[in-house]
A protein has these predicted regions:
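Membrane-interfacial, low-structure loops and terminal tails that flank and connect transmembrane helices
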Residues: 2-43, 80-88, 115-131
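Alpha-helical transmembrane segments
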Residues: 42-60, 101-109, 127-145, 165, ...
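Membrane-interfacial entry segments at the cytosolic side of transmembrane helices
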Residues: 124-129, 226-234, 364-379
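Functionalized membrane-embedded alpha-helices
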Residues: 127-142, 154-190, 237-251, 295-339, ...
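Membrane-interface helix caps and helix-loop-helix hairpins in membrane proteins
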Residues: 148-154, 194-205, 337-345
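Internal/C-terminal transmembrane anchor helices
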Residues: 237-246, 367-399
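Membrane-interfacial catalytic/cofactor-binding modules of polytopic membrane enzymes
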Residues: 240, 244-306
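Extracytosolic and intramembrane catalytic regions of membrane-associated proteins
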Residues: 403-572
Length: 572
């Protein structure tokens, strides 16, 4: 019996295999498997994996901060090179490993030189079409870095560094090998805004990551098997990781669905208006428009989540969907600008550069080649999904809050020797103007309280509901009186040192220097139109005053509850 069982069982199985062979299903299955796991798709995946590994290695080099002493020098680059040479000498003497802060850029460049590998845009298939998109991004970052307003705090123009940035950005048109130099220089110049008071780099961080990807792509292109589709896949993954991370943060914030169904995005617009956005529009005209827009809070929140969550997969499914999604992301940034005056112009320009590149010609061929491989979809989704650890990209984690009707608005006023008072426009503190545009410096006061954060935002659901339940202005004041004191001696001392040095330098120089930089300069991240007599360096400053205004958006009107001087600092 045991010897007959296999024979009986094998007959139907054999007939089934014959049927499959006769029907051609085997050939179809084999063809599908080869398309997904064939030699070319797997080779393509290995190229992208190697590119991601290269990004992990070089990203800390291209994006690393440098000590503040280099910004004190007349030339950032010269100071870095001198330090690198000194440290290399010491490393050789003491046999210790060292990675230079700037001269590391020369190593891969020398590899190309000594191996006689002359890299041009024509070395890549559809490289010329890619050049147009890349040059827009590099040119934009070069414009942002090279036209930063004169740094009054450091009292340095860094003109040589600006020239070098423009030079390497322009040289990128001829040779992609100049792109890593332009990327590093633009980041170095932009990072000076973080001293001495740190500020978020979210307005250009994603673009910096894309430049890291392109720099790694350029250096790996010493091997001629790399193609623009490899770069495009990771460039889109950069954007996808940033959008997806913000969507996840909003969805998981507070009680289930609270950000979607209960948060009021129109409150952000009210706070932005009280802060100075669109202040040239009379309040009697603006508030009715805001009341109408309030009806669309939930649809706007739903659209935001749809775009951000969808970025996990939409960039890699089909060429047409890739183009549509990148355009929807641009539309999202334009909507944020209209609602708040917060202008992610670097993101917007990069979105549009990628869209027009992928729209026709060589770029359309590149995105089709990228989407043709199913492994690219799986890998792109995995890169985005696991990016929260910030090993390869730096997506903003926890970008979620509730927008309330109550706002604490801080302004800087200055007084001259005659007692005349002026309002400081936040952009006068450039290149670190974002911190002053946000207008949240309760830390600089003594004994003052703080109920909400930047633009009236809070991170506590119960506090959000309490503010939303306010029925009359006096309830808002009562709630504010219960808020915690925001006294911070360390931050207050940093604020004092900044003001003393900033206005000390300004008084000695007789006003703002190199104003031509602002004439050709880049747009600011936050747009404000403060109303009042603005200070423009017309007279020496003897005192700095911090003023705080409490504002409540109630019954379609802005109630300014308290306008108070909360700090005064003499300029010696």
């Amino acid at each position: 019996m045991s010897t007959d069982a296999p024979t009986v069982a094998s007959e139907p199985r054999g007939r089934a295999l014959d049927v499959i062979r006769a029907s051609g299903l085997a050939d179809l299955g084999r063809g599908a498997l080869l398309r997904v796991l064939g030699r070319d798709p797997v080779s393509e995946l290995l190229h992208v994996v190697a590119l991601l590994l290269a990004v992990i290695v070089i990203r800390p080099l291209l994006l690393s901060d440098i000590p503040v002493a280099h910004y004190e020098a007349p030339s950032i680059v010269a100071s870095l090179i001198l330090e690198d040479i000194y440290n290399l000498q010491r490393a050789a003497v003491f046999a210790t490993p060292l990675v230079p802060r700037f001269l590391f850029l020369i190593v891969p460049t020398l590899v190309f030189y000594f191996t006689r590998r002359r890299l041009t845009w024509d070395d890549w298939e559809h490289g010329r079409s890619m050049r147009a998109a890349v040059m827009v991004v590099i040119g934009m970052m070069a414009w942002a870095g090279a036209t930063l307003p004169y740094n009054v705090y450091f009292d340095q123009a860094h003109l040589l560094d600006r020239f070098l940035l423009v030079f390497f950005a322009a040289a990128t048109w001829s040779t992609p090998l100049a792109a890593p130099f332009a990327a590093r220089l633009s980041i170095l110049l932009l990072r000076q805004a973080n001293f001495p008071i740190g500020q978020d780099t979210f307005d250009y961080r994603a673009i910096a990551d894309i430049l890291v990807v392109f720099s790694a792509f350029v250096w790996l292109s010493h091997k001629k098997s790399y193609h623009p589709k490899h770069f495009l896949l990771l460039a889109l993954a950069v954007f996808g990781s940033y959008y997806y991370a913000t969507g996840v943060a909003k969805w998981n914030f507070g009680p289930p669905y609270s950000w979607l169904l209960e948060n009021r995005l129109s409150n952000l617009t009210a706070s932005a208006y009280a802060h100075g956005w669109l202040s040239f529009i009379p309040e009697r005209w603006f508030m009715p428009l805001l009341g109408f827009a309030r009806r669309f809070d939930v649809p706007m929140a739903a659209f935001t989540l749809f775009i951000e969550y969808g970025s996990l997969v939409a960039f890699f499914l089909r060429p047409s969907l890739t183009r549509i999604w990148i355009l929807l992301c641009a539309l999202l940034h334009f909507g944020i600008f209209l609602m708040s005056g917060i202008f992610f112009w670097k993101w917007l320009v990069t979105n549009l550069a990628l869209f027009f590149w992928m729209r026709r010609g060589g770029g359309a061929e590149v995105v089709r080649a990228m989407c043709r491989n199913a492994l690219n979809l799986a890998f792109g989704v995995a890169v985005i999904y696991f990016s929260f650890d910030r090993i390869w990209f730096s997506p903003q984690i926890g970008v979620a809050w509730y927008d309330t009707r109550f706002m604490e608005h801080y302004e800087i006023h200055v007084v001259d020797a005659k007692g005349s008072k002026y309002l400081m426009h936040p952009k006068s503190f450039a290149p670190g103007e974002v911190h002053w545009e946000q207008g949240a410096f309760c830390y600089a006061t003594v004994g003052e309280r703080s109920l909400t954060s930047i633009y009236g935002t809070v991170y506590d659901y119960d506090l959000f509901k309490r503010i939303e339940a306010i029925r009359e202005p006096k309830e808002a004041l009562a709630l504010y009186r219960q808020a915690p004191i925001c006294d911070n001696p360390q931050w207050r001392n940093t604020f004092d040192q900044f003001m003393l040095r900033f206005f000390g330098n300004l008084n000695r120089s007789g006003g703002f220097q190199h104003r031509w930089l602002t004439w050709i300069g880049r747009p600011t991240h936050i747009w404000l139109q403060p109303q009042g007599v603005l200070y423009d360096g017309q007279t020496p400053v003897v005192r700095v005053e911090v003023w705080r205004t409490l504002v409540l958006h109630h019954q379609n009107a802005l109630h300014r509850l308290e306008h108070k001087r909360v700090r005064s600092l003499d300029i010696r």
